[in-house]
Design a protein with these regions (language model features):
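Catalytic and substrate-binding regions of extracellular carbohydrate-active enzymes
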Residues: 1-168
Length: 168
């Protein structure tokens, strides 16, 4: 809209996630996990990027533990194990989206030859599932989550969904 920009990013198993490389951003673990960015001016997140906790990216359901992540080169990115990520919009004021989220490494898909740093495990990225729905109704965003399941309850770190991450 003329008043704001809203991005909701998700990737089913039919898509590759956002790549990461050692010379660029090798902490691209969560941008396709329903990352939800709200912007009025375009620079809202610029000042906090150095201290950004990728496990608390806006809209993302993730296990706490940024300090336990090892940076990787991942040319396929991360996506969901499930084939459902959908959205529709009227081009103006209304949109809806839904996602079945259970993270997988893109290099684990069949017939992939560019494995990147697949040997780096980063186990805290995996082991939970969530069903998420989004509805944009004019100036309102309704975000719903259901069935958030911790499949590895013995693993350190709570599962949380972050609404926003700001400098203040």
């Amino acid at each position: 809209t003329p008043d704001y920009h809203l991005m909701i990013n998700m990737a089913s198993v039919r898509c590759d996630g956002l790549e990461s490389a050692a010379f660029a951003d090798n902490y691209n673990f969560n941008p396709t996990d329903v990352m939800t960015l709200f912007q009025r001016h375009g620079n809202e997140y610029f000042q906090i990027m150095e201290g950004w906790d990728v496990t608390a990216s806006p809209g993302v359901t993730a296990r706490e533990g940024m300090e336990r992540l090892t940076p990787v080169t991942n040319w396929r990115g991360y996506c969901s194990r499930h084939n459902f990520a959908a959205g529709a919009a009227d081009g103006a004021d209304y949109a809806a989206g839904g996602y079945i989220f259970e993270k997988m490494h893109g290099a684990d898909k069949e017939n992939v030859n560019d494995k990147g740093d697949r040997k780096v495990k980063n186990e805290l990225l995996y082991g939970f599932k969530a069903y998420k729905g989004y509805f944009v109704l004019g100036d309102y965003l309704v975000a719903l989550g259901a069935g958030v399941t911790n499949n590895c309850p013995d693993m350190e770190g709570h599962i949380r969904t972050t609404l926003d991450q700001t400098a203040r």
